[in-house]
Amino acid sequence: MTRACATQVQQHAAPTWGQVPIPVVYAASEQEAPPGAWVIAILDDPDQADALGWHTEEQGDLIYGRVFAAPVLDNGGAVLSGALTVSGVLSHEVLETLVDPHVNLWADNGNGDAYALEIGDPVESDSYEIVVHGTGPVGVSNFVTPHWFDPRAGKDQKFDWLGKVTAPFRMTKGGYVVVTREGKIQQHFGETYPEWRRAMKHADTSRSARRTTT
């Protein structure tokens, strides 16, 4: 799944966002990770209740994240292939770390509201597969483009990688957004957003919790 995430960053997300395509590599343990690397570990069970995947800052401005397999598998998901996968959660975390590693960027919608720069959340329940040689298809997360955060973007623009969203600041039925409105931070869920995922958005270590408590 690391190779699928690397391909997604290099060929899809980084070019779309005008970012340098940072390497995504596998390490058997944190100790074997390259010096200075931002580590996203895949673990079986959450070390904090209701945490699906999160990343945060450690000392020295390094980013440290975790993805937990059990919540995905316990709710009908799979490891690599399907609509809900551990690889998709990893992809989601990698993508959002790429674009907003410090979880502090917001975009103004032109009407006084500010939307969190979380590129996976608005289309969180949508995924696609990348074929990895020797492994087969691996699920990765859909993500929104810079046009999604631009209130002046026209309807002819591409707002997400899979083309499911038709206007800026809109989410799919299985999406989620964090919005600052009149000085208050709010969370909005799509009509089919799973209840088990909602609880995880409130986990103390989630990106969403960091948004809503700062």
For every predicted segment, state its role.
Residues 1-24:
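Zn2+-dependent metallopeptidase catalytic core
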Residues 9, 13, 51-57:
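Broad hydrophobic/π-residue packing in well-ordered secondary structure
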Residues 9-17, 93-94, 98, 102:
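Sec/Tat-exported extracytoplasmic proteins
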Residues 23-55:
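Short, well-ordered secondary-structure micro-motifs within conserved domains or adaptor modules
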Residues 47-48, 55-63, 69-80, 84, ...:
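Metalloprotease/metallohydrolase-associated module, dominated by Zn2+-dependent proteases
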Residues 82-95:
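Short alpha-helix carrying the canonical HExxH Zn2+-binding catalytic motif
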